């Protein structure tokens, strides 16, 4: 038995005949010491509801529950994993709800409300499937209601994506993702995870990112900000007067008080907000 009284994860995947599917962006994390570290990176989980995406055979799920989460709602698209997750649920009666479905079609705000946590009580903790991780993060960063339905997000990404999330202006990694994350959250990389921690091992290093919502982000229309960053970074090597030409070009930049010869990667989050509010 493992430290939580359940079978080792390698035994679980062997008994259930589970193999990670590349089409689903799966890489199973089998080291319970590592899943425990991820759970602890999310903060004190005592009496907290947690939403998890892509639990697979339940390694992180087990860590969340053993670290005190009052309730975990786990969304799993792969029906092959449901039997293994049912065993975890039986070990923690009444504390794990497994939702069989597609995370991209999930109403997370409704899910959080049903989990019994008002805003500030629900945390998102997940080893996100690589093929949908960025899309999910953007959705969570751009929810209309703010403060959002989550108190924090602790998420695993490929390190290259993680670096884009926490990137500062002027760096090669800085782009739309960094602007959105910096606008609405305080984001940091908690730690890196080597490929050999996974089954099968991916070709790249992964990173766990912790994001906490800002109570009062600078006011801006989220859809407009999306259009501005898309235009600006769509031609990131060009001067802003060219890259945002479709939004008003030099006249827009003049209203925002921004030098039209600058490039998108040099603008701070505050300047992007100013630009957005000038559209």
Swiss-Prot record:
Main location: cytoplasm
Keyword Flavoprotein part of the UniProt annotation: no
EC number of this enzyme: 2.1.1.182
InterPro entries (UniProt xref): KsgA/Erm, rRNA_Ade_diMease-like_C, rRNA_Ade_Mease_Trfase_CS, rRNA_Ade_methylase_Trfase_N, rRNA_adenine_dimethylase, SAM-dependent_MTases_sf
Catalytic reaction annotation: adenosine(1518)/adenosine(1519) in 16S rRNA + 4 S-adenosyl-L-methionine = N(6)-dimethyladenosine(1518)/N(6)-dimethyladenosine(1519) in 16S rRNA + 4 S-adenosyl-L-homocysteine + 4 H(+)
Keywords: Cytoplasm, Methyltransferase, RNA-binding, rRNA processing, S-adenosyl-L-methionine, Transferase
UniProt xrefs under SUPFAM superfamilies: S-adenosyl-L-methionine-dependent methyltransferases (SSF53335)
Binding residues for S-adenosyl-L-methionine: 27, 29, 54, 76, 102, 127
Subcellular location(s) of the protein: Cytoplasm
Pfam families: RrnaAD (PF00398)
GO molecular function per UniProt: 16S rRNA (adenine(1518)-N(6)/adenine(1519)-N(6))-dimethyltransferase activity; RNA binding
First-tier enzyme category under EC: transferase
UniProt GO cellular component terms: cytosol
The UniProt record lists the keyword Methyltransferase: yes
Cross-referenced NCBIfam families: ksgA
Listed PANTHER family: DIMETHYLADENOSINE TRANSFERASE, DIMETHYLADENOSINE TRANSFERASE-RELATED
Family classification: Belongs to the class I-like SAM-binding methyltransferase superfamily. rRNA adenine N(6)-methyltransferase family. RsmA subfamily.
Summary of the function given for this chain in its UniProt record: Specifically dimethylates two adjacent adenosines (A1518 and A1519) in the loop of a conserved hairpin near the 3'-end of 16S rRNA in the 30S particle. May play a critical role in biogenesis of 30S subunits.
Protein name as it appears in the record: Ribosomal RNA small subunit methyltransferase A
């Amino acid at each position: 038995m493992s430290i939580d009284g359940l079978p080792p994860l390698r035994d679980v995947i062997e008994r259930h005949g589970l193999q990670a599917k590349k089409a689903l962006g799966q890489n199973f994390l089998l080291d319970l010491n590592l899943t425990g570290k991820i759970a602890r990176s999310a903060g004190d989980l005592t009496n907290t509801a947690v939403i998890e995406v892509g639990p697979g055979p339940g390694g992180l799920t087990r860590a969340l529950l053993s670290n005190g989460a009052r309730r975990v709602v786990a969304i799993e698209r792969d029906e092959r994993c449901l039997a293994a997750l049912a065993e975890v649920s039986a070990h923690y009666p009444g504390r794990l709800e497994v939702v069989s479905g597609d995370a991209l079609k999930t109403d997370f705000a409704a899910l959080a409300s049903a989990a019994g946590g008002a805003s500030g009580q629900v945390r998102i903790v997940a080893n996100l499937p690589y093929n949908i991780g960025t899309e999910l993060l953007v959705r969570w960063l751009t929810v209309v209601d703010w403060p959002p339905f989550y108190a924090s997000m602790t998420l695993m990404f490929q390190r290259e994506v993680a670096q884009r999330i926490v990137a500062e202006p002027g760096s090669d990694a800085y782009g739309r993702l960094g602007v959105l994350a910096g606008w609405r959250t305080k984001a940091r990389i908690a730690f890196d995870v080597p490929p050999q921690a996974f089954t099968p091992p991916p070709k790249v290093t992964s990173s766990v990112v912790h994001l906490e919502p800002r109570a009062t982000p600078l006011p801006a229309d989220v859809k407009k900000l999306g259009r501005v960053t898309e235009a600006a970074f769509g031609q990131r090597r060009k001067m802003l007067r060219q890259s945002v030409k479709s939004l008003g070009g030099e006249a827009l930049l003049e209203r925002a008080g921004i030098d039209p010869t600058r490039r998108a990667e040099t603008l701070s989050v505050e300047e992007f907000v100013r630009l957005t509010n000038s559209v």
